[in-house]
């Protein structure tokens, strides 16, 4: 009898220990760390910068999948629909305007860089040579058109309605001494259009993609201390409620790392400027 009791006791103890160990394993498994982070990005410079972050994240146990886009809509709708975890392609104002116009719920996580807008030569090779009735191409989306027109105003080429700011369109031009013809084109087509217009005001990423550099090739660029620097900072964005996800925080940290800062400064010659 004593032997039977001893055996029962040993079995119970073993079962208890096993359960306790099982509970501990179960408890530790509740700490979830996503392995895959899927991010949408413009090809240049965003996907290139993410390539540096990808290496840093790999050391933390994350796999970063970079999905490249050539438009400004799908990267946002894909995050909203849950097809992507985040995106990195747009500036603050575009993000705010997109949410308002489309009823999406996207939020900024961190700013990463700033791309100065530039005025680039087409048929006309300098601002001084600009003839009466010259054609100037600008982005046709509301967010970037205002920014382009403000740069033209800063160069004394046009004058806009007072306090119209970044919402300006060509309809807000009140003075146009050279009778410039403002052509609104898709931002992605501006570099290709240079052969057909006198000048074009081009987004930083599309300029780089087209082999142009704001620091070297532009006839004029936005002032580094202008309001545009903050307003148009390019950000990492996610759907609201996911800002504190472990993978997103790891990605944000990688994008604001010294390695990324060094990569930007060494590879873009002033066409891309880190915001950290």
Describe these PLM feature segments:
Residues 97-109, 123-124, 196, 201, ...:
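Ligand-binding "clamshell"
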Residues 1-36:
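Short, low-complexity disordered leader/linker segments with a strong preference
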Residues 144-153, 255-275:
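Periplasmic-binding protein-like
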Residues 32-44, 62-68, 135-136:
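Short, well-ordered beta-strand elements
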Residues 66-77, 164-192:
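Short helix-initiation/N-cap motifs at beta->coil->alpha
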């Amino acid at each position: 009898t004593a032997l039977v009791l001893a055996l029962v006791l040993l079995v119970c103890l073993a079962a208890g220990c096993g359960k306790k160990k099982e509970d501990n394993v179960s408890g530790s498994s509740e700490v979830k760390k996503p392995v895959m982070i899927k991010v949408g990005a413009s090809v240049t410079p965003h996907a290139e910068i993410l390539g540096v972050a990808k290496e840093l994240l790999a050391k933390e146990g994350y796999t970063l999948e970079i999905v490249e886009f050539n438009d400004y809509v799908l990267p946002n709708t894909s995050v909203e629909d849950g097809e992507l975890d985040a995106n990195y392609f747009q500036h603050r104002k575009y993000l705010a305007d997109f949410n308002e116009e489309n009823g999406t719920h996207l939020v900024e996580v961190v700013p990463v860089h700033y791309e100065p807008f530039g005025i680039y030569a087409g048929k006309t090779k300098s601002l001084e040579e600009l003839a009466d009735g010259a054609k100037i191409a600008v982005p046709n989306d509301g967010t970037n058109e205002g920014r382009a027109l403000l740069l033209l105003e800063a160069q004394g080429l046009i004058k806009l309605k007072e306090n119209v700011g970044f919402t300006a369109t060509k309809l807000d031009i009140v003075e146009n001494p050279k009778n410039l013809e403002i052509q609104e084109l898709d931002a992605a087509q501006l570099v290709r259009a240079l052969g057909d217009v006198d000048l074009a005001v081009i987004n930083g990423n599309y300029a780089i993609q087209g082999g142009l550099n704001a620091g070297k090739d532009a006839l004029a660029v936005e002032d580094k201390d202008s309001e545009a620097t903050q307003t148009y900072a390019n950000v990492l964005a996610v759907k609201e409620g996911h800002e504190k996800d472990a993978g997103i925080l790891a990605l944000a940290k990688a994008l604001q790392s010294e390695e990324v800062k060094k990569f930007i400064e060494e590879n873009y010659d002033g066409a891309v400027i880190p915001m950290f």
